[in-house]
């Protein structure tokens, strides 16, 4: 990747040629989890540029008043003015200069504007959020509508200030992911978590659904259904739980968007789900579900960086098959210490969702020992 700011921009921590950093990540993973050296491991590197679907920039004016995007300098909070960012999807890269030019010529839109956020996808829709240290009034909204209409590739525009959000267009983009040649549509909401690297995300989903299905599926940490929807093509019944109200709302919308009827999304955290399935607590949110009718033999988890923790990991040992996507190899290592008391690892996978950073996504398929 050719970037004039590589090595000085704080956004990319690994200033190495892509092939070198990918080999480094694989090596570090295998050292941390020696079992992976003797276990089938599938490798999914990223494209070296034009891969990232989200971006957050500060706004910076130099001494002559010229406006530019900015990142923090490496190892510092000092702003580093930039005009482009080659890791971003082409849809974002193409919009950045024209958006900046339009903003620079409008005093109302730039007054107390401190940040710009981009959200896009393979569908090429682009949603932009403008972040302010001021109350947004009718004059701002009129100028923002003019900005939106003047930029054909800008799908929606959101203005944000403390306690205030003005949506011009939609508060989401509609993304299409192609999984094993089948298109799946998703609403990706501004401000909510979405996978940052859509092409690698497609590979992650394909890898997970390639595992032979068993019985019915329980999913914890389901988010907006990124994995759940494609998994529905493999399982007769799925119960998917998630603590975020916004994500559950989006997941149900995504079900409707794809005409899927055999997933039940419920707002519960992992510990609450465990309590419900073990009969320790009854939840009003589960009142319409016939839990005893489920034949849970498989469980899928995609936990946050903190991992599962010993309690949830112990609970998963009751399932014959465990499908695990991890965004933190260190917590995966500690979770596997618990899971391997009863299960064998059948396969690993490494996914580079975050090139030019130390972060690495991985997958594990485990099966209960007989």
From Swiss-Prot:
Keyword S-adenosyl-L-methionine: yes
Residues that bind S-adenosyl-L-methionine: 195, 221, 226, 242, 302
Catalytic reactions on record: uridine(54) in tRNA + S-adenosyl-L-methionine = 5-methyluridine(54) in tRNA + S-adenosyl-L-homocysteine + H(+); uridine(341) in tmRNA + S-adenosyl-L-methionine = 5-methyluridine(341) in tmRNA + S-adenosyl-L-homocysteine + H(+)
GO biological process, one term: methylation
Alphabetized InterPro entries for the sequence: MeTrfase_TrmA_AS, MeTrfase_TrmA_CS, SAM-dependent_MTases_sf, TrmA_MeTrfase, U5_MeTrfase_fam
CDD domains linked: AdoMet_MTases
Active site: 327, 361
One term under GO cellular component: cytosol
An MF annotation (GO) of this entry: rRNA binding
Enzyme class: transferase
Keyword Repressor: no
Family: Belongs to the class I-like SAM-binding methyltransferase superfamily. RNA M5U methyltransferase family. TrmA subfamily.
HAMAP family: RNA_methyltr_TrmA (MF_01011)
Function: Dual-specificity methyltransferase that catalyzes the formation of 5-methyluridine at position 54 (m5U54) in all tRNAs, and that of position 341 (m5U341) in tmRNA (transfer-mRNA).
Protein name per Swiss-Prot or TrEMBL: tRNA/tmRNA (uracil-C(5))-methyltransferase
Source lineage: Bacteria, Pseudomonadati, Campylobacterota, Epsilonproteobacteria, Campylobacterales
Chain's gene name: trmA
